[in-house]
């Protein structure tokens, strides 16, 4: 029964995290994928409060989960369901466009979460080899993932930094492709090339 509650907690947590991450990536996209503009958007009055509100239930579910007991774990699952509802996508004038860049950002974020969970599980197991590892590993992973959940608005920065070489390579490919096409037309008079 406890395993089932852990699975439900993890599933509801992940769905809430994915919905919140989609909102964050949408805002990053609205700011033209520019970290400086996105940072300025974060600092606008009300945005931090709104973002914290979107993470509040997931963050409150953590102490309940760490306390243990079926009642606390069930309450933690209910709070995660509230997180899912709070992060329900709203109608936007300009909705999130699932470009290849957005997909790469989502995959990179998922990999960061998986690495953080794996590292926390392994370190918890190494530190407390005498204890029941599943309980300690699960709680440690839950703690690390909950902290990451709250930090998602700023996790965009390292994700963007990790993906930056890929994005530059893609941009370089298109520039080189345009230069090649122009070279194939020797009689063409080039006045200017725009984006």
Predicted regions located by residue number:
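The Walker A (P-loop) glycine that initiates the GxxxxGKT/S ATP-binding motif of P-loop NTPases
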Residues: 195
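Short, basic phosphate-binding NTP loop
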Residues: 5-192
């Amino acid at each position: 029964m406890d395993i089932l509650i852990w699975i439900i907690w993890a599933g509801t947590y992940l769905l809430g995290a994915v919905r919140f991450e989609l909102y964050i990536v949408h805002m990053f996209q609205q700011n033209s994928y520019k970290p400086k503009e996105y940072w300025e958007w974060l600092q606008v009055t009300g945005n931090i409060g709104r973002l914290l509100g979107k993470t509040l239930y997931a963050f409150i579910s953590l102490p309940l989960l760490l306390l243990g007991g079926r009642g606390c774990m069930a309450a933690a699952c209910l709070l995660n369901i509230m997180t899912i509802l709070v992060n329900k996508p709203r109608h936007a004038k300009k909705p999130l466009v699932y470009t290849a860049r957005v997909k790469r950002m989502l995959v990179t974020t998922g990999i960061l979460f998986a690495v953080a969970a794996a590292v926390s599980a392994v370190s918890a197991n190494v530190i407390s080899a005498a204890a029941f590892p599943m309980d300690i590993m699960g709680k440690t992973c839950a703690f690390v993932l909950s902290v990451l959940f709250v930090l998602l608005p700023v996790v965009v920065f390292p994700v963007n930094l990790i993906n930056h070489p890929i994005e530059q390579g893609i941009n370089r490919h298109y520039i080189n492709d345009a230069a090649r096409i122009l070279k194939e037309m020797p009689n063409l008079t080039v006045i200017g090339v725009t984006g």
